[in-house]
Amino acid sequence: AQASAGAPPEPAPAAAPDSAAIRVARSVTPSQVDPSLQSGFNQFNAGNVEGARRSYGEVLARDANNRDALLGMAAIAQKQSQFEQAQLTYQRLLELDPNDADAIAGLASVRPADPGQTESRLRRALQRTPDAAPVLFTLGNLYAQQRRWAEAQQAYFRAYTAAPGNADYAFNLAVGLDRMNQGKLALTYYQRALALARDGIGNFNQDAVRTRIAELGGQ
């Protein structure tokens, strides 16, 4: 289906982390999840950035190398446009594990670099971990910045397939499809993104999405 009148929105520049305590909670029993880590994740997604910072800080006071808490701190810095601090935190994570897909994706999203070098770095990370959703999402954004929409849409689709509960992944997939004039499919994923973002988790303008849904013939 062809897109209706009106311009598709721009992709979300960064995704709310499908990370930290929630990934831990998927792999271990809830009683084993650090309460401060879970609190940090919940507060970040509720918009309480300072509360999240305190909770992650409690974890790091006990374990300075805690990966999930460091990722949380990096996400906070990025959300507050403290890009230098975010970069330092991602670099710290890469010192702990040079192959950390989340850190590779995070660093690529906050540090200006040659697009070709960034693409190569992200592709190398995907060779090691083909289903690394944050890397796929960041690669999609890199393609989108260059208006390589077919490649962006494919990367967003792979990111969404790997993490279908992430509102930002669904939104950017919708944008990619929209830019490819696949309005009917785009509508489905815009609606999915809104449904996933009902709890406030999402780095996109929900009113703009509702407007675009109406333009595409949705309710």
Can you describe what each PLM-predicted range is?
Residues R26-N65, A75-K79, P112-A113:
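Alpha-helical segment of the N-proximal tetratricopeptide repeat
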Residues A46-R54, K79-R92, R111-R124, Q146-R158, ...:
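Structural signature of tandem alpha-helical TPR/SEL1-like repeats
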Residues R62, L96-D97, R128-T129, A162, ...:
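Structural marker of alpha-solenoid helical repeat scaffolds
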Residues A69, A103, V135, Y169, ...:
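TPR alpha-solenoid repeat register
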